[in-house]
């Protein structure tokens, strides 16, 4: 029996292509993740894959597994991150980004829950549920993304971190969803 912990993978990281949110270049993030011994890093800029090519080149150079993804804030729902599982997933992700960008003015996007009806095949979906998220939401998302929905907890270093984690654990347990 081994006591070694599994490798750490950052599943949600924005670069300076997420304007006013990310500060570092994608390639700098990759190099730093490798220095810290990460097993993998997901670059997940908001409704964009703009940093992926540079991140890919850097990941090849340092031998880090790069996960390709994007973050979305739905107009009528929560924040989600989608991670492409393969080339088909990458194509589905780019189609969703294109749909959202075409609907809005330059530099913006507009996506709703209805736009996810296809289930965005071949993508893992990280749901940033909140303590206010409902069982109905969990059932709906689980049905839309069968076997590919993970509830995501971000430690924000706020006084309510423990309460948020408890609520998300309950939601994950009730609906048999992984919590990451």
What would you call each of these model-derived segments?
Residues 1-180:
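Phosphodiester-processing cores and adjacent nucleic acid-binding clamps
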